[in-house]
Structures are given as structure tokens and as C-alpha cells.
Amino acid sequence: MAKAKFERNKPHLNIGTIGHVDHGKTTLTAAISKVLADKYPDVNEQRDFGAIDSAPEEKQRGITINIAHIEYQTDKRHYAHVDAPGHADYVKNMITGAAQMDGAILVVAATDGPMAQTREHVLLARQVGVPYLLVALNKSDMVDDEELLDLVEMEVRELLSDQGFDGDNAPVVRVSALKALEGDAQWVKSVEDLMEAVDENVPDPVRDTDKPFLMPIEDVFTITGRGTVVTGRAERGTLPINSEVEIVGIRPVQKTTVTGIEMFHKQMDEAMAGENCGLLLRGLKRDDVERGQVVCKPGSITPHTDFEANVYILSKEEGGRHNPFYSNYRPQFYFRTTDVTGVITLPEGTEMVMPGDNTEMTVELIQPIAMEEGLGFAIREGGRTVGSGRVTKIIK
């Protein structure tokens, strides 16, 4: 019986519930768990509301987040589902990338329509690159007037379009999480319909191995008679031996060829995402490369110094700063394997940022880093983390 849990013969996706406080995110999560456990009992185990709501505290890079993880399967897919009960938890989770989502269910109470946090969550989802949103119009059993439901649906679609999602075509499913939990047949079906919409509409994620190769350099050393070796953990892609690569970041871009690949002291024909490996680089000296650069497929990533970011600043209790900072604050930005100093400019109208706040900012680094939108980083002072963020837009 239990064996079915570990059969990974279905595509795996990470999804989550987002939306305004008390619109029913956690109740919907519990309802999905129950409905699927009833429908496919062999592969699903029901998790009740209490277990999800009392989400354990997790530490991600020193930031405390309450977040619940549950898993379930439909006929087509295996899902890992994250539910962050509190608004602050959700914001931290999105910005720190504690749980990357392939798609999200935006929960909007039909009784209220979109509220302040609904907007903020959708904006954040776009900024951190959640690829797909669909909508659960929850508490639909409490609205008798069909026209009112249509109106709320229109409002939600408009909000999605405003934030750069496909509001016209996003599925909007009318559900009642509470009634589904109580076993009311009409509303159980609504949750089944919702999961069918998730199955059909959230695209399969691009597997890491299918992306262009990238390995952050952690260490550099010389093997006498053979040349310079860089080591690190391949972040994505595959790299066959004798491929051309670029070394990007910190210094001008260099081109070279990988003439040897080693893992656990064995010679390999290719390096793959997720593996720790050593790459032998043709014609480069020990001093030509350093920690903090990346080895990548030529042309796949470029070095940049100026960017916009969305950042969460740790509270004092989380070990962060004790006092606010202002524009021109110069901390270290830790990208992948190295710290680079950067100058912060706060947005117009933001005088200062307090510990525990989340904010947008513009950053100018003193050295270029291999960068793309969505890349995560930590903000550090003297080696301790005081914030965590993501690149939302590259300026130069």
C-alpha cells in the first residue's frame, strides 16, 4: 500500500495556495487533500485542517517561516503543495524562494472579492516568476446571486491582467472548501474540477537538466601537467566533455573548452545538474578564474551590476539588524558562492527600511555578477545575513 508514495512515474510539480488572509487558503488545501484521498485512496493520505494550519516553523537562511508542505496525487501528476498561513510568512516565502512554485492557486473569497493582500500576492508572484496562476473563487456557496459571482470573477481577471498574468484565459473555478470538507457532493465536485484545471493548465516545468548548463565556481586549483580545475555543483543543464564554455562574472567574460570532467575521482563523459564535479579548463591559469564566477554554456547568461530587487529584511529577533537603513547603504550581496559589495537606492517615497520589512530597491554592485531575473541572493554585513531577496529586473 505505502509503496505507491515513492513511485515517481508521474510528472512532479510544486504548487501553492496564495491570497488574502481568511479567504480560505488553508481550508482549501485541506479540502484538496480530503477530496483526492477519497478519490484516489491508494496514493493519497488525508491531512486535516489542524495539521496544515499548525504549520511548523522552518528556518531558511536564518529567516523563520511558518509553512505547511503536503503532497498529493491526481491521476496525471504528483504535487507538492505549500500553504503559508500568515501574510508575513507568505511574503518571506516568496522572496526567499523557500518554496519555488511551478504554479499557484489564487484563493479569493466570493463574499469579499480581491482585497489588499490579494493584490500584493499576485504582484509578488509575478516578480518572483511564478509561471502560472489560476483562481479558486472560494465560499461560492454563500453567494446566491449569480451576477455577483460574475462581477467578482471579472474583478479578479482584471487584477491578473494588471499584473502581467493572462487574466482573460486563466481558469476561475467556483468552489466551497468548507462544504467540500463536509462531503457535500456538489462542492466536492467543485474541488475535483479545480484540480482538473490545475492538471490541464499549469505547464510542466522545464527540468533543470534541459536548461543551458551553469555551474557556480566554488574552488580553483592546479593539477600539475594537466591544467586548471574548477569545482562546484552544477546548477542546471548537462555538459558533454570537450564543450566550449564561458566563464562569466567579476572579470571580463572568458571562453575556454572543458577537456576533462571528474566526479568522486572518476573521469566522466558529462556533467549534469545537481552533481558536484571538477572541470578541467583548457589554456587557463590558476589566477584567471575565481570563486564567484560561473561556468556556463556560451551566451546563456550575462554579467550585470545594476538591478532592481524585492527584498525581505530580517527582524532583530531573526538575528538581523537592530536599526533601519537608508539609501546609499552598502552591504555585501551574496550571489551563489561569493559576496560583492553593492550600493542600495530605495524607491521614491521610502525614507528608510526597518528590520522585518519587505521592500523594493535598486542595487549597483561594484563588480558584475552572472545574473538573470529571478536569481536569489542574501544581503550580509560582516558575514551575517541581514536580508534575502530576488532580482526582479536587470538594468545594466
Swiss-Prot record:
Domain of life, source organism: Bacteria
Protein purpose: GTP hydrolase that promotes the GTP-dependent binding of aminoacyl-tRNA to the A-site of ribosomes during protein biosynthesis.
Region (G5): 176-178
Residue span of region G4: 138-141
Residues that hold Mg(2+) according to the record: T26
Pfam families cross-referenced by the UniProt entry: GTP_EFTU, GTP_EFTU_D2, GTP_EFTU_D3
Keyword tags: Cytoplasm, Elongation factor, GTP-binding, Hydrolase, Magnesium, Metal-binding, Nucleotide-binding, Protein biosynthesis
Residue ranges, annotated region (G1): 19-26
Protein name according to UniProt: Elongation factor Tu
Binding residue positions for GTP: 19-26, 83-87, 138-141
UniProt organism field: Kocuria rhizophila (strain ATCC 9341 / DSM 348 / NBRC 103217 / DC2201)
Coiled-coil boundaries: none
Region (G3): 83-86
Gene Ontology CC: cytosol
GO MF annotations, alphabetized: GTP binding; GTPase activity; translation elongation factor activity
